[in-house]
Amino acid sequence: MVCLALLWIKRRRDSAIPVLGALCGLAWFLVFTFVWVRPVKALAGQTVTCTAVVETDADASYSESRLRGTLRLTEIDGRAANVKVECASFPGESAGEQFTAKFALTELPDNKYRLSRQSKGVYLQVEYLGSYHPLEASRAPRFALYRLRQRWLATLRRWLPRQLDGIEAAMLLADKSRLDDSVQQAFRTAGVSHLLAVSGLHLALLCGLLGFGRKWKFYKPLILLRAAAALFYLLLTGMPVSVSRAGIVLLVALVGDFFLLPPDLLTSTSFAAILLGLQNAYAPCDLGFQLSFCAVLGVQAAATLARTEQRAAQDKPAAAKALCQVAEPVQTAALASLATLPVLVAHDMAASLVGVLCNLLVVWMVQPALQLGILLLVCSAVPFLAAITNLTALVLSLWLKGLLWLVRCCAALPFASICLPQRYTLFALAVLGALAVCFWHARRLRLYLPAAALCTVLAVGLGVWMQRDVVQINLIGASNNPCVVCVQNGQAVVFFRGGESNWSAVQNYLAGRSRQEPALVVDLRAKPTQMEFSAAEIVTVQELADFTTRPVLDGLTLDLYHNKSANLAVLGVGERHIAVGAGRLELAEPVRVDVLCAPGTLSDSVRPDTILYTAAAPRWLDDAAGCTLRYGEDTPGLTLRPGRSMIWEEAQTIAVQ
């Protein structure tokens, strides 16, 4: 294959470097998998006694004095090792602790989080079995920096109000533990969630504090100081992929300044990608890696376009030059958003239609927020500067409050966030990409814009027509008792079970999928507690008659059954019936349904053909003989076209043992 590729390359010189790069990348992936990953995965299925170190991503588990997160196994059954594993619950208080214990090693579950964990060097998961024995805490430098970061986080919490301290901690220290769900959702909906993830923008702004203008740009001691500051910040934040990429690019640029060489963003970015891929061949599977590099490509394209426009406007009036300057930030935001769109769609994430506007409004506010945050940390460390500390905290709070207000205003705009159909959108983007290659090869790129615009209009029109009346049903929330959300034509019906956390998960899911608040919330709980549902209509089944029926959405029917403390809702979509229940229902005649969603128990009064569930080991599993079982760990569901097809999403068939 390599020989054929080389022969083909000789005839196509322009494609030599990309093809050779792809072949080298594939070869390195195979070598990395065989040499490093395969021996680790061979440990799966064993029960071992290990010495483990708690890594810095560990956070509180559901039980008291328990953590969950990544463990680094430094010794396995008396043999030295260096294996990172995922553990859902283990004894501990903070990162850096060491202990010995017995673990059961298993492979990572085959779900959408698998590649993300592998990109962080985690190839196994473990279950804690006991025999806990604490050891002396690790003295590795990364834990000293982690403790320093925690002290600075405590300082921000002490001086800034709730919500605002979480925003500053995320932007300055890459810590999202204090971010409210509502704040994260607002930034995500407005298309500026990248501001809450430390990246090249933040690193460049912070290191720019040591720039002192163009006069001192090539002053070598100052270059070394900027490089040291960048390296310290990399280590302080724990070196996530986006920060590592930005740090490598910045260090390469500083090396260029040191030797008086011109910078090249595209080459530096490629070099960073190669380094990250060499240390872990799965690194490109990380979402942050993909978004970061795609955004850089968009920024690079915008810079090239801006230079072309400036050259064309050299002999034009001052108004044309001013127009180019005004258009540059708009083009940068638009092309960066467009470059990251395929990644967002591939990961089934919502895209923002107000991202360009919101970026223009708030990105300039990030640098003052970072500068004020640093000033607050410095002043708070000096007792006699308490007055300056109070003033800095006040100014920073007002600044962050203004930033958050702008973000929420943008997020509240109509169609701020939309969820595009994954496969169809990726196909349309692939067609547009193929057209771009064809026009570039034919040297007719100027004709590409009208052709792409026409194809986009046709794709959007066809997509809207194809999605009309399609019903999407998903399980959202706690795995043992999830809610069921039905979306059709931008309207939603929520079958509610559980508590506040389930409702929060439903709201996050509906962002971008529904144009307004849910049209109907059906409360299936046996003992409904007081909760504030934001919905056009709320129906509590416990307060209804034994049986009621009504139309919902566009041409769907809803049958509601009530018996003592058990409730059942059956949604009719054409000839198919989807059931959601709470409690063990007893009816005179059984109800036959096509799909039963995540039951807590099985009742003889409900006879499903298929059961869709999210719990790993439900109690009713042994009683499900004769039913097809469909399991999905994260938001499984199905898509129905009334009177036509039913397609399962993120749900695999499970064989009954």
Q: How would you describe each model-predicted region?
A:
Residues 192-217, 518-535, 594-606, 614-620:
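Di-metal (Zn2+ and/or Mg2+/Mn2+) metal-binding site signature of metallo-dependent hydrolases
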